[in-house]
UniProtKB/Swiss-Prot annotation:
Organism: Deinococcus geothermalis (strain DSM 11300 / CIP 105573 / AG-3a)
Record protein name field: Sulfate adenylyltransferase
UniProt KW keywords: ATP-binding, Nucleotide-binding, Nucleotidyltransferase, Transferase
InterPro entries: ATP-Sase_PUA-like_dom (IPR025980), PUA-like_sf (IPR015947), Rossmann-like_a/b/a_fold (IPR014729), SO4_adenylyltransferase_pro (IPR020792), Sulfurylase_cat_dom (IPR024951), Sulphate_adenylyltransferase (IPR002650)
UniProt GO MF annotations: ATP binding; sulfate adenylyltransferase (ATP) activity
Membership in a protein family: Belongs to the sulfate adenylyltransferase family.
Pathway terms, separated by semicolons: Sulfur metabolism; hydrogen sulfide biosynthesis; sulfite from sulfate: step 1/3
TM ranges: none
Presence of the UniProt keyword DNA damage in the record: no
């Protein structure tokens, strides 16, 4: 086994130059009585995920929920007010009726328990229609991101946050902050690392992309999103277990790291692809895979819109290299995984299963074909769906 030298490991600089850390240090003197009498705000699933991403530095250079100038700049220019690339406004919405209650230090709660604080510096009106048109490219409430946008409050609170403790959730063994992922990359001596994200169960086309890129870089960060997703998406626990069995049998362990990505899905397609790439830079990653319809839903985005949007920035601004792949699939005639660039055969030779088709087969108790996914992964999915009956 080749051992990489750690002598010259230089990880990518976090966006903005410094990895934000707004997590209260362990052992810090803290008197819960300090929170008594302060206004309390119960966080939604998405806002709680945003709090963690902000506080741990995954959303560096942001130190809290966006103020109005940054909010409008991100919507209209895909940049913060100072020009830093940023594609999706990270906001904390409340109802207009409640907004006046929140001033100064606000206690953020989850299930009634205090999990952090927000120092309110601004309250401003959300431009929901503008945000829907520019960020999601539609005002159609059948789009899950747009539906969530219109369902939330119409006033945004802004200011720096503090997180009391990193929530390790259901995957403590795989839950690492950006600084912790950076430490693993440094310890392993990876000069170049590629990150891959999906909210879907892993299949052979994903594996193909992973192994092609492992020919080019030192390490692979498998970074499945485990925050809030649509109700019909495969549950995070099932997806993580599928990754575990795949890594056990088919991946080089010394060159692969499985770590969960606790963000919530917004289904913003191209805009969300940028957010996913920039945040991976903060995790210390040098390359990020963007495939077909990354972070998309339905027919709202073109197949490769999420790849083309990166031309809005220079490579130096991005600070992470985007690896763009076409749709890959199994060709029965070629007898292997291919793409339109490498296969001369028509679609009748190809095995392509959509996410909807996969879910239909699983609900019907059918086993997924070996050409589509590894047998071990197929069994994990079959058991998970059988348990739902």
């Amino acid at each position: 086994m080749t051992t990489l030298s750690t002598a010259t490991i230089l990880l990518p600089e976090p966006l903005g130059g410094t990895l934000v850390n707004r997590v209260r240090r362990p052992g810090t003197d803290f008197d819960p009585a300090e929170l008594q009498g302060l206004p309390r705000l119960e966080l939604s699933d998405r806002s709680f995920a945003d709090l963690e991403m902000l506080a741990t530095g995954a959303y560096s250079p942001l130190t809290g929920f966006l103020g109005e100038a940054d909010y409008l700049s991100v919507i209209e220019r895909m940049r913060l007010a100072d020009g830093t690339p940023w594609s999706i406004p990270i906001t904390l919405p409340v109802s207009r009726a409640e907004a006046e209650r929140y001033a100064g230090c606000v206690v953020l709660t989850r299930g009634g328990e205090a999990v952090g604080t927000l120092e309110v510096q601004e309250r401003f009106e959300a431009r929901q229609s503008l945000e829907a048109r520019e960020v999601y490219r539609t005002e159609d409430t059948a789009h899950p991101g747009v539906a969530a946008l219109y369902a939330q409050g119409d006033v945004n609170l802004a200011g720096p946050v503090t997180l009391f403790e990193v929530p390790r959730g259901n995957f403590p063994r795989h839950h690492r902050t950006p600084s912790e992922v950076r430490a693993v990359i440094e310890a392993r001596g990876w000069r170049t690392t590629v990150a891959f994200q999906t909210r879907n169960p892993i299949h052979r086309a994903h594996e193909y992309l992973h192994k092609v890129t492992l020919e080019l870089v030192d390490g692979l960060l498998l970074h499945p999103l485990v925050g809030q997703t649509k109700g019909d998406d495969v549950p995070a626990a099932t997806r993580v277990k599928a990754y575990e069995v795949l890594l056990e049998h088919y991946y080089p362990k010394e060159r692969t790291l499985l770590s969960v990505y606790p963000a919530a899905m917004r289904y913003a397609g191209p805009r969300e692809a940028i957010l996913h790439a920039l945040s991976r830079r903060n995790y210390g990653v040098t390359h990020f895979i963007v495939g077909r319809d990354h972070a998309g839903v339905g027919q709202y985005y073109g197949t490769y819109d999420a790849q083309e949007i990166f031309s809005a920035y220079t490579p130096e601004e991005l600070g992470i290299r985007i690896l763009k792949f076409e749709h890959t699939f199994y060709c029965r005639t070629c007898g292997q995984l291919v793409s339109p660039r490498t296969c001369p055969h028509g679609s009748e030779h190809h095995l392509v299963l959509s996410g909807t088709k996969v879910r239909e087969k699983l609900r019907a108790g059918e086993r997924l074909p070996a050409e589509f996914t590894r047998p071990e992964v197929a069994e994990v999915l079959r058991e998970a769906y059988a348990a739902q009956d």
